[in-house]
């Protein structure tokens, strides 16, 4: 059995609405919500986006993959 790179990689998901609100002078949220998860590189070659709960926005928002 050939051994190569592991297709599963660890990725960090960051709330997209917190990032937008944090850029303004009036900061509505005290922080940025981040989740750590894994994705299969073969099945999902592009950026991963999941709808997760953001404790700073108090609602479900889209969390996008960020680079390390």
Curated annotation (Swiss-Prot):
Its main location: plastid. InterPro entries: Ribosomal_bL33, Ribosomal_bL33_CS, Ribosomal_bL33_sf, Ribosomal_zn-bd. The keyword Ribosomal protein applies. GO terms for cellular component: chloroplast; ribonucleoprotein complex; ribosome. It holds the Pfam family Ribosomal_L33. Keywords: Chloroplast, Plastid, Ribonucleoprotein, Ribosomal protein. It is found in: Plastid, Chloroplast. The keyword Membrane does not apply. GO terms for molecular function: structural constituent of ribosome. Disulfide bonds: none annotated. It comes from the Eukaryota. GO terms for biological process: translation. Coiled coil: none annotated. Belongs to the bacterial ribosomal protein bL33 family. This is Large ribosomal subunit protein bL33c.
């Amino acid at each position: 059995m050939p051994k190569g790179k592991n297709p599963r990689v660890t990725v960090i998901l960051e709330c997209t609405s917190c990032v937008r609100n944090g850029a303004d002078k009036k900061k509505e949220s005290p922080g940025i919500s981040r989740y750590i998860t894994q994705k299969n590189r073969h099945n999902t070659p592009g950026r991963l986006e999941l709808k997760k709960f953001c404790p700073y926005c108090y609602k479900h928002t889209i969390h996008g993959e960020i680079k390390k």
